[in-house]
Each structure stands twice: as C-alpha cells, then as structure tokens.
C-alpha cells in the first residue's frame, strides 16, 4: 500500500482506496488511444467496455485505480523514474487498465493424440491437451498470474503450437 500511496502522491495514479471498476470517459479515451498506438486498431472493441462492481459494500465514490492523466505513460516510459515496488505496482495498474478496454482473446481448445510404432511392444500412445491462441486480444497487455514464478505448472494452461493431422514431430527424450 505504501508503493501505491507514493504513486498517488506523486501523480502517477488516481486515488487508490476505492473498489470502483468504473473508468472516466477521459481514462477510457486514453486507454483506447494507447491500445491503438501500441497494438493496432484490431485490439480496440467497437463499444467501450464497462464492468459492474461485484461487492455490495464497494467504495465507489472515486473511479477505478488507473494511471493518472489524459494520456497514460507506459511502464517502460517510467523506468528511470520508478524503482522496485513502485514500478511493479504501476505496471500492474497500467496493464489491467489497458487490458480492460481491449478485445477478448480467442483461441481453440485442442486435444492431441500421438501414436508411434514401438516395435515389438506395439503402439505407444501419447495424449496432451491445451489451447492455441488465435487472437491474443487483452493478453497482449496482461496475463493473470504470469508474474508468479511459484505458480504450479500443472495448474496453468499449456499453449500448443498449431499442428496438422499427419504432421511428423521430433521426439526428445
């Protein structure tokens, strides 16, 4: 909370003691403009995205926590001004604000079954499942949990490369 307080006091973010999910028109415009310049117009949805607060006792007198100003400074643009926790907190706020105004990601869930001749032992069968991202959408700006090095690998989705039936694959042991 000290890092966020410092960011607020120095004009980097808006008021941070709020539960609000609402962004001002100015913030939405800044986010959409930045999305277009960083990722291209294909990442901006036609309609502004709005979100409802899920908690009954939410403190919504202020708008959502976001980068301050009429245009947002990127975390990279502030690298020389912010250090340690302040840089990480700002990056998280920036990522979530920008991602909140981007199109959804699209992908295909895939189940793959590999069969290989195992000689005298018959056929070896291997299976895996995962997803292939066909359009990254908001994932270009923010992936939930990607900054958690201790996350259980088994709990994370695996990204699979595009494959075609009959394609030969290298085997590694």
Regions from the PLM with identified roles:
Residues 1-59, 65:
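Extended, well-ordered alpha-helical scaffold/bundle regions in very large, multi-domain proteins
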Residues 5-6, 12-13, 18-20, 70, ...:
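An acidic- and aromatic-residue-enriched active-site/binding cleft used to recognize and process polar
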């Amino acid at each position: 909370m000290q890092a966020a307080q410092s960011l607020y006091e120095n004009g980097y973010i808006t008021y941070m003691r709020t539960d609000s999910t609402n962004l001002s028109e100015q913030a939405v415009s800044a986010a959409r403009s930045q999305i277009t310049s960083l990722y291209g117009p294909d990442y901006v949805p036609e309609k502004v995205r709005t979100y409802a607060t899920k908690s009954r006792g939410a403190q919504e007198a202020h708008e959502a926590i976001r980068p301050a100003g009429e245009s947002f400074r990127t975390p990279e643009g502030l690298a020389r001004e912010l250090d340690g926790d302040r840089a990480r907190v700002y990056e998280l706020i920036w990522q979530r604000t920008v991602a909140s105004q981007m199109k959804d990601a699209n992908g295909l869930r895939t189940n793959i079954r590999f069969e290989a001749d195992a000689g005298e032992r018959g056929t070896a069968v291997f299976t895996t499942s995962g997803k292939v991202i066909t359009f990254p959408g908001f994932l270009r700006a923010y992936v939930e949990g990607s900054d958690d090095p201790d996350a259980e690998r088994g709990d994370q989705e695996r990204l699979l490369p595009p494959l075609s039936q009959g394609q030969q694959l290298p085997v590694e042991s």
